[in-house]
C-alpha cells in the first residue's frame, strides 16, 4: 500500500509542475470538469473556527499533491479559494446569524459549524437547501441535516471522525496473563460485548501488596465518554426524532436506561476512583490501568494521553444487548450555504465545495489515511478498529439542540451517579423536554426561561413559608 501511495504522489507532483491547460494533462484522479462553472475571478471563503488560510512552508508529499489539486481548481473555475477562520468554535452560529439577518451576500461563503450547534441553524433557516453531490458526503451527516425531506448541510467528506473507543494497555493485560490479541479476536467475531469486557476487567484488578487497596485498576477515562458510549453502544439515545422532525425525550427508554444502569455499575466496580473529570490524564501514564474509554484522538493523534504508555491497542466500544453492531457517538462538523444567495449562486457554491473536499491522493489510494497511524499502534487497531469506525458511527439526536456540554451533560450525564438511573432520568425530564420544545417550535426560549423563573420563585416561596411555619411551632416540652 505504501509503495503504491508513493507512486501516486510522485506522479501527481510531477503533473503539478505542469500547466493543466490541455485536457490531456489533467491527472486521471481529478474529477470531471463541470462545464459552465465559472466564478469570474471571485474569492470563495470556506469559513470555520480553526483554519489559518496559510499553506505549509515545507509541505509533505501528500500536502503538496493536495495544494496542486486546489491550484487546478482555482485555474479551472476562475476562483480563489480561501479556507480561514471566521469566529470561535462556539460563536460560528452567531456569525452565521449575523450574515443572514443582514442579508449580507457581499462575499461568497460556505460556513462550517460544529455538529452540536446545528439545531439553531436548522430551526432558524440559516442554511439554504443543499441539493448537489450528496452522495459525496457522509450519509449519516446528510440524514442528520435533512428535515422535511430537504438537506441543509454536509460535512467534510464521506467518513466519520471516530469518537468513543476502548484503549488498552498491553503490558497490564500481559501481566495479568491475558493475551491482548484475544480482544481483537472477540471484536472480529462479534463477541466483544459488555459482559466480555467485564470478564477482562475482573481479571486485571489486583492488590499487589496485600494492603487492601487496589494497585492495578480496570478502567479509567472521561466518565462522560463512558456514559454516552454505553448508551450509543446499546442502540439508545436521549431523544427520539419523529417522522415530522420533532424531538421527544427518550432517556427513559429500555435501551438507554439499561446503559445508564450499567455505567453506574462500572463506576462502582471498575473505574479507578477519581475526584476531577480529567484525573484519567494522570492515571493512565502511571501504567496501572488496563482500559481507557476515550475518544480516538486521544491515541491516534499521536500526542495525547494514550501515547504516554509504550504499547497500546484499541477496539470499538463493546456491544450492549440491544445492539447488532459496533458504533460510536459521532460529531461531524457541518458546512452549509448561508441563506442569502439566489439559487444559481448557492448551487455554484455547493459545486465548488464538493470539488474542494475531494482529495485525489486519498481517492487514488483508499488506504492512504492510515499511513501515519501505523507508527502509533498495532495494525489491528488501525485496520480493524479505526477503519471500521470511520465508516460506522451514530449522530445522536441531542446534537440538534447543542453539544453534550450544554444539553445532556449538565442536565443528566454529569450527575448520573447521584441516585438510581431512573430517578436521575426523571429529574432531568423537565429541562430536557423544555430544550426539545424550543427546537420543535412549541415554545420560545423566552417562554421557557419565564416558566423556569416562576417555578423557582414558587419553590422559594414555599420553602420560606415552611421555614416560618416551623419557627412558629411551639418547642417540644
Language model feature labels by segment:
Residues 6, 18-117, 344, 363-367, ...:
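Conserved N-terminal structural module of periplasmic/extracytoplasmic solute-binding proteins
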Residues 304-371:
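Extracytoplasmic/periplasmic substrate-recognition and gating elements
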Residues 9, 13-17:
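Hydrophobic core
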Residues 45-48, 108-111, 147-159, 164-166, ...:
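Extracytoplasmic/periplasmic solute-binding protein
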Residues 198-202, 238-276:
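Glycine-centered hinge/linker elements that transmit conformational signals in sensory
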Residues 132-137, 187-189, 237-258, 320-327:
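Short, solvent-exposed loop/beta-turn-alpha elements that line the ligand-binding surface or hinge
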Residues 25-44, 87-93, 113-164, 195:
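Hinge/lid segment of periplasmic solute-binding proteins
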Residues 329, 351-419, 450-459:
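Long, aromatic- and glycine/proline-rich binding clefts that accommodate carbohydrate-like moieties
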Amino acid at each position: 500500500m505504501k509503495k503504491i501511495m508513493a507512486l501516486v504522489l510522485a506522479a501527481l507532483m510531477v503533473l503539478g509542475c505542469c500547466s493543466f491547460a490541455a485536457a490531456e494533462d489533467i491527472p486521471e484522479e481529478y474529477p470531471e470538469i463541470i462545464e459552465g462553472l465559472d466564478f469570474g475571478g471571485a474569492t470563495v471563503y470556506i469559513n470555520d473556527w480553526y483554519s489559518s488560510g496559510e499553506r505549509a512552508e515545507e509541505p509533505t508529499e501528500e500536502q503538496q499533491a493536495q495544494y496542486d489539486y486546489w491550484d487546478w481548481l482555482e485555474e479551472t473555475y476562475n476562483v480563489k479559494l480561501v479556507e480561514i477562520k471566521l469566529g470561535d468554535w462556539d460563536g460560528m452560529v452567531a456569525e452565521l446569524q449575523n450574515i443572514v439577518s443582514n442579508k449580507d451576500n457581499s462575499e461568497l461563503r460556505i460556513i462550517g459549524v460544529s455538529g452540536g450547534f446545528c439545531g439553531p441553524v436548522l430551526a432558524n433557516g440559516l442554511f439554504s437547501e443543499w441539493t448537489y453531490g450528496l452522495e459525496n458526503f457522509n450519509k449519516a451527516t446528510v440524514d442528520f441535516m435533512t428535515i422535511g425531506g430537504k438537506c441543509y448541510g454536509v460535512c467534510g467528506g464521506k467518513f466519520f471522525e471516530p469518537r468513543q473507543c476502548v484503549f488498552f494497555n498491553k503490558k497490564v493485560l500481559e501481566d495479568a496473563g491475558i493475551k491482548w490479541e484475544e480482544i481483537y479476536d472477540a471484536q472480529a467475531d462479534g463477541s466483544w460485548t459488555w459482559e466480555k469486557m467485564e470478564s477482562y476487567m475482573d481479571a486485571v484488578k489486583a492488590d499487589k501488596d496485600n494492603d487492601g487497596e487496589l494497585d492495578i485498576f480496570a478502567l479509567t477515562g472521561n466518565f462522560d465518554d463512558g456514559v454516552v458510549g454505553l448508551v450509543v453502544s446499546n442502540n439508545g439515545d436521549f431523544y427520539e426524532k419523529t417522522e415530522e422532525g420533532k424531538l421527544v425525550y427518550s432517556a427513559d427508554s429500555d435501551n438507554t436506561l439499561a446503559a445508564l444502569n450499567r455505567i453506574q455499575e462500572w463506576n462502582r466496580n471498575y473505574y479507578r476512583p477519581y475526584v476531577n473529570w480529567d484525573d484519567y490524564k494522570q492515571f493512565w501514564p502511571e501504567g496501572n490501568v488496563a482500559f481507557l474509554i476515550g475518544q480516538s484522538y486521544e491515541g491516534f493523534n499521536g500526542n495525547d494521553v494514550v501515547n504516554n504508555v509504550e504499547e497500546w491497542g484499541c477496539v470499538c466500544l463493546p456491544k450492549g444487548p440491544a445492539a447488532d453492531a459496533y458504533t460510536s457517538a459521532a460529531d461531524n462538523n457541518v458546512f452549509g450555504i448561508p441563506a442569502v444567495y439566489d439559487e444559481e449562486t448557492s448551487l455554484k457554491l455547493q459545486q465548488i465545495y464538493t470539488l474542494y473536499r475531494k482529495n485525489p491522493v486519498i481517492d487514488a489510494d483508499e488506504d492512504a489515511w492510515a499511513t501515519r497511524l501505523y507508527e502509533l499502534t498495532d495494525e489491528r487497531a488501525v485496520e480493524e478498529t479505526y477503519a471500521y469506525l470511520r465508516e460506522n458511527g451514530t449522530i445522536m439526536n441531542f446534537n440538534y439542540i447543542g453539544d453534550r456540554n450544554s444539553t445532556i451533560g449538565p442536565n443528566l450525564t454529569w450527575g448520573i451517579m447521584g441516585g438510581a438511573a431512573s430517578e436521575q432520568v426523571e429529574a432531568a425530564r423537565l429541562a430536557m423536554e423544555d430544550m426539545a420544545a424550543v427546537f420543535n417550535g412549541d415554545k420560545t426560549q423566552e417562554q421557557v426561561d419565564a416558566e423556569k423563573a416562576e417555578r423557582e420563585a414558587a419553590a422559594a416561596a414555599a420553602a420560606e413559608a415552611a421555614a416560618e411555619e416551623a419557627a412558629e411551632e411551639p418547642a417540644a416540652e
